[in-house]
Amino acid sequence: MKELICAFAVVATITSALAQGDVVYDNSSDPVLGTFVPEDTSLEFGDQISLSGDASIVTEFRLEYFSSDAAGTGVIRFRANDGAVDLQGGFETGQLEPSTVLYESASFPLQADFNTLEITGLSVPVPSDMFTFTIEFSDVPNTQNVGLLLRNPPVVGSSFDGVWVRPDNGDWALRQIPLTTANLAAQVVAVPEPGTVALALIGIGSLFGFMRRRR
């Protein structure tokens, strides 16, 4: 009986820990290196990141931005990097452009000053532990300063040192930011795939079964 109670306690603890998720990407540490937004603030742009660890179902996402005024809106998207090979000056860079939309948020109002946008309750599978998160601003007045914060380096995971920007023609392009590293401030929390959790629980069950037989 004691062994059964112990087994349930271990399973409950592990299941609870897995449900809470792990920080698989974190670029939220000081210093702040500035902000970035394309000259045309209506263009979609974002950062390509790689997640750390085995958890690949995104459950939480945080993004830092600045806005001088409480006006305009934004939309967050997660895109798989499964598009065409990026070209610069007619030569292939070897990087695949963002394409397939994995997630799109509802439109949210921009708030004045420095802000952290927090999105929770997600369940977004990420292919190959890598994706590009983007933002698209709308209805931003010409007099308004708005942009995403730049930080470096990420303390968990890694980020491609460039920003993807989608011009009006729809062809994505990589842009570098002079005198700084183009890593947008963000944090990602994820949980393992259900199959991984199931295998872990099966392994625990087998271990307790073996221990009972030994007794």
Question: Where is each model-derived feature located?
Answer:
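A short beta-strand element within beta-rich, extracytoplasmic domains
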Residues: S56-S68
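Aromatic- and Gly/Pro-enriched, solvent-exposed loop/edge beta-strand patches characteristic
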Residues: S67-F160
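Short beta-strands within extracellular/lumenal beta-sheet-rich domains
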Residues: E39-S52, L117
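PGST-rich, cysteine-poor low-complexity/disordered linker and tail segments that act as flexible spacers
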Residues: G21, N152-V191
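Short, threonine-centered small-residue motifs that mark membrane-proximal processing/anchoring sites
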Residues: K2-D22, L184-L201
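Boundary/junction segments of secreted and surface-exposed precursor proteins
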Residues: L18-P38
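C-terminal membrane-anchoring or membrane-association module
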Residues: F208-R215
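Extracellular beta-rich ligand/substrate-recognition surface
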Residues: P31-L43, F108-A112
